[in-house]
Swiss-Prot record:
GO terms for cellular component: cytosolic large ribosomal subunit. HAMAP family: Ribosomal_uL29. One of its GO terms (molecular function) is structural constituent of ribosome. This is Large ribosomal subunit protein uL29. Belongs to the universal ribosomal protein uL29 family.
Amino acid sequence: MDIVDIRSKSNDELRELLVNLGKELVNAVLNRKVDKSTNHFYCRNIKKDIARVLTVLNERRKEEKHV
């Protein structure tokens, strides 16, 4: 997911996306444990997407504090 797409979403959409990414990460980790042939970089990409979403949410929260 691109950072431009993340920044264009509202806070509620980002929180929903964060929940979905968390579920997706759990499923990916479990599938990786069961099936060794899955793409190992997929989990890393999900973690990076989660970090991007959290970064945008924290930036917005800090911005609201200063205003």
